[in-house]
Amino acid sequence: GRLEGARTTGDRMMRRATIAGALVALAASGAAADPVGRTEYMVACAGCHGESGLGDGPLAGLLQIETPGLTRLAAENGGEFPYADVIATIDGRDGLRAHGGPMPIWGERYAQAALASGAAEGTMTPDMMARARILSLTLYLISIQE
């Protein structure tokens, strides 16, 4: 019922706040320059968003929507990088995007890839592997902000 929905929303908010806090700590420690995130970006995002994040990738002209640039996310958010929104957008498994949208649902793709490769074994679940890739990618996006 309503209480269950509220708990789910509260859980999502708490998870996003926790992730955002982890990102702030990682960014402050210099992890934002991690090459793993850059590699992930070049493989998963540059085709549409461009190698420099300006929204001018080789596939951008083939899409029926305008591909946004990613270098001014902080500037367009009052100088603060919108951690939770970026993570949720990349992940795509929460909310309306899970039912289809202009971006791939990377969280599901990453989790399936971890499961298929056998990389998610022991204490690392496919979901944890997916979130790690999303966090690396988010840290890279922080590093390219103007």
Where are these regions (language model features)?
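Short, Lys/Arg-enriched N-terminal segments with co-localized hydrophobic residues
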Residues: 1-13
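Sec-dependent N-terminal signal peptides
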Residues: 17-27
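C-terminal partner/receptor-binding element of secreted or periplasmic proteins
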Residues: 131-145
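Electrostatic cytochrome c docking/interface patches
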Residues: 25-41, 71-79
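Axial heme c-ligation environment in periplasmic c-type cytochrome domains
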Residues: 61, 68, 90-132
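Periplasmic/extracellular electron-transfer cofactor-ligation site
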Residues: 38-65, 79-80, 88-104, 144-146
